[in-house]
């Protein structure tokens, strides 16, 4: 496995900001590399010296449990040094700009910065600023507003492909598979990134949700839209439910959580419409009894949520490794 990691990689991307222009070959490379690191994480000693001496900064301006912790564990498993930034206790509270904060870490020798922000486009702006300074630092988008969440979509892709072939996860395994994404599509950066990856890999993507949370613009991504759940679920191989982002929506978009669950909540009865062997995904955090019932979430025969979390560490290890040059420091 370690010999495979030392092989030359056709990776030319400096940043991971969006999946809109990711190629099938790049998805294949990420999956292959993540598969190798998944083997590392299954060992008793879950650490390799690959990025020893490198500095990874987690620049999170928005609350996060899974994503920040996953990036931290990924960097530490690669033996990198990790700095976790807290906006609440930083000089931002004194009027410092995000760019000045980033430049401060640049002066301290960071190699990769992971940026999460409530506003769309911030990671891209940070990347442009670093490029204008002539810095070789790479930027990873860990979620920006309603725009994208590339690493979540990559770990979802890895979860699906390893389920279909644990020994050789590859994008073409999703060809012809019906994948349904249900919920607050309008505000979901996860949905946008997953649309990019799943369609590129040959998946048949269907979106379902209330008309107020599922605008027609999503057809341009190659998805089929449904405002009624039953037709969307018919013959589905995978169903991904999304959290209702009440903090981003006005009261006029949704009558009530109870009404939403009645019309769009995933229950065992509704799963009968899907293909035999259907599996469930959720990027988290989950509102139990709203997006899907608790018994489904806790059923290991149906739920892939724990596998998604596990996949996240391996996928983020792969991205850090590839951005660092695909070789040990």
UniProtKB/Swiss-Prot annotation:
What EC number(s) has UniProt assigned to this enzyme?
2.1.3.2
**Molecular function terms, GO-annotated:** amino acid binding; aspartate carbamoyltransferase activity
InterPro entries for this protein:
Asp/Orn_carbamoyltranf_P-bd, Asp/Orn_carbamoylTrfase, Asp/Orn_carbamoylTrfase_sf, Asp_carbamoyltransf, Asp_carbamoyltransf_Asp/Orn-bd
Reaction equation(s) it catalyzes: carbamoyl phosphate + L-aspartate = N-carbamoyl-L-aspartate + phosphate + H(+)
Q: In what pathway does it function?
A: Pyrimidine metabolism; UMP biosynthesis via de novo pathway; (S)-dihydroorotate from bicarbonate: step 2/3
| Gene Ontology biological process terms in this record | 'de novo' pyrimidine nucleobase biosynthetic process; 'de novo' UMP biosynthetic process; amino acid metabolic process
Pfam families associated with the record: OTCace, OTCace_N
PROSITE patterns per the UniProt record, alphabetical: CARBAMOYLTRANSFERASE (PS00097)
Which amino acids does the record list as binding carbamoyl phosphate?
A: 66-67, 116, 149, 152, 284-285
Does the keyword Transferase feature in the UniProt annotation?
yes
Which HAMAP family does the record cross-reference, listed alphabetically? Asp_carb_tr (MF_00001)
Complexes and interactors: Heterododecamer (2C3:3R2) of six catalytic PyrB chains organized as two trimers (C3), and six regulatory PyrI chains organized as three dimers (R2).
Q: What is this protein called?
A: Aspartate carbamoyltransferase catalytic subunit
What's the source species for this entry?
Gloeobacter violaceus (strain ATCC 29082 / PCC 7421)
Report the gene name: pyrB
């Amino acid at each position: 496995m370690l010999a495979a990691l030392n092989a030359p990689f056709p990776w030319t991307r400096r940043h991971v900001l969006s999946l809109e222009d990711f190629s099938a070959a790049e998805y294949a490379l990420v999956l292959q590399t993540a598969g190798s690191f998944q083997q590392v994480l299954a060992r008793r000693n879950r650490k390799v010296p690959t990025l020893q001496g490198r500095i990874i900064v987690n620049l999170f301006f928005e609350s996060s449990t899974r994503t920040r912790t996953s990036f931290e564990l990924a960097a530490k498993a690669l033996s990198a040094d990790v700095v976790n930034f807290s906006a609440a206790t930083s000089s931002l509270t004194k009027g410092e700009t995000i760019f000045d904060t980033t430049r401060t870490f640049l002066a301290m020798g960071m190699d990769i910065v992971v940026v999460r922000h409530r506003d769309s486009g911030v990671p891209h702006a940070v990347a442009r600023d670093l490029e204008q300074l002539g810095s070789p630092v790479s930027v990873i988008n860990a979620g920006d507003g309603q725009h994208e969440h590339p690493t979540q979509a990559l770990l979802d892709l890895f979860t699906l492909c390893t389920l279909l072939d644990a020994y050789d996860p590859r994008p073409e395994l999703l060809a012809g598979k019906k994948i349904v994404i249900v919920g607050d599509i309008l505000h979901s950066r996860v949905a946008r990134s997953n649309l990019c990856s799943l369609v590129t890999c040959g998946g048949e993507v269907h979106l379902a949700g209330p008309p107020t949370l599922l605008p027609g613009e999503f057809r341009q991504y190659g998805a089929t839209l449904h405002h009624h759940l039953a037709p969307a679920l018919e013959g589905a191989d995978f169903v991904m439910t999304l959290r209702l982002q009440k903090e981003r929506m006005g009261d006029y978009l949704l009558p009530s959580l109870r009404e939403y669950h009645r019309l769009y909540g995933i229950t065992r009865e509704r799963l009968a419409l899907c293909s035999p062997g259907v599996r469930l995904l959720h990027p988290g955090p989950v509102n139990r009894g709203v997006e899907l019932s608790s018994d489904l979430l806790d059923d290991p025969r149906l739920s892939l949520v724990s596998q998604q979390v596990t996949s996240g560490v391996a996928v983020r290890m792969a991205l850090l490794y590839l951005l660092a040059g695909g070789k040990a420091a």
